[in-house]
């Protein structure tokens, strides 16, 4: 699917108000469960699967969910918490992690670009939904710094770096394709009309198409791009898996109507080889080995919207084992609601 086709879809959604009011009752109901389980009164979203830490990703997800459900009070509390505790003073990006009880609570000032893009996506949508132009200006400021600070050339690609520090090697750059939050990149182009966003999206589509490995032709959690030639390989230093991070790739590209038919076909083949009752939590892209445990409900929700034949109703957040599985599930609820509206 071309970027221009996806952009046209995004502009239709924006102009018809679907971005401004995408929440049927199901989304609002699931948000209420997420809010009760993972949002603290301070506005801090808690990652229960990682020792109760918080991060820019979680704040972005929470803000996006609240905007989708029309919950302005919760949105404001999460945005204020993120600005106060995570946003940099020298740019508009966000430190990636907050550790309650530690001194300092933000020991690492490095950003996580997906968190930045999720917060900007939430701000842009909240600005439209709640008629708050200041939120849209905040989103545009974040997008400007992501574009200027987090993109670079690697071979034939303009790539989106995962963070400011730690991902540039002598001969390669390390990417996380799940950090390409495609609905946010579409919104960035829609708000700014900067053609550089089009290049980032087009190259993101190319990277997802070319950067797939193993018998199932799946993207790895971490991908290396040769800085001179653009050759792609599974990054060393991480398990060579399709797992915790890469599970978001089909979701984000489906949501933005950018999931190419051949890529969708490979995901569909993978999901249905195992089925809903035996889908692995990870698969090794070099050996084909699978996790000894099955995928949590959030992974099944992603599979359900990208080709799993045996799926039934979407899981509810009542049964989510932790924050991340719940977040994936609620993202699917929102993506499906917007598909229905479109």
Swiss-Prot record:
Stated role: Enzyme capable of hydrolyzing carboxy-methyl-cellulose (CMC).
InterPro entries given in the database record: 6-hairpin_glycosidase_sf (IPR008928), 6hp_glycosidase-like_sf (IPR012341), Glyco_hydro_8 (IPR002037), Glyco_hydro_8_CS (IPR019834)
Family statement drawn from the similarity comment of this UniProt entry: Belongs to the glycosyl hydrolase 8 (cellulase D) family.
Top-tier EC class: hydrolase
Active site: 57 (proton donor), 114 (nucleophile)
Pfam families linked to this entry: Glyco_hydro_8
Enzyme Commission code(s) on record: 3.2.1.4
Gene Ontology cellular component list: extracellular region
Catalytic activity entry: Endohydrolysis of (1->4)-beta-D-glucosidic linkages in cellulose, lichenin and cereal beta-D-glucans
Signal sequence annotation: 1-20
Biological processes per GO annotation: cellulose catabolic process
Gene giving rise to this polypeptide: cmcAX
Record's keyword annotation contains Flavoprotein: no
Cell compartment(s), UniProt: Secreted
Record-level Gene Ontology MF annotations: cellulase activity
Protein name: Probable endoglucanase
Keywords associated with the record: Carbohydrate metabolism, Cellulose degradation, Glycosidase, Hydrolase, Polysaccharide degradation, Secreted, Signal
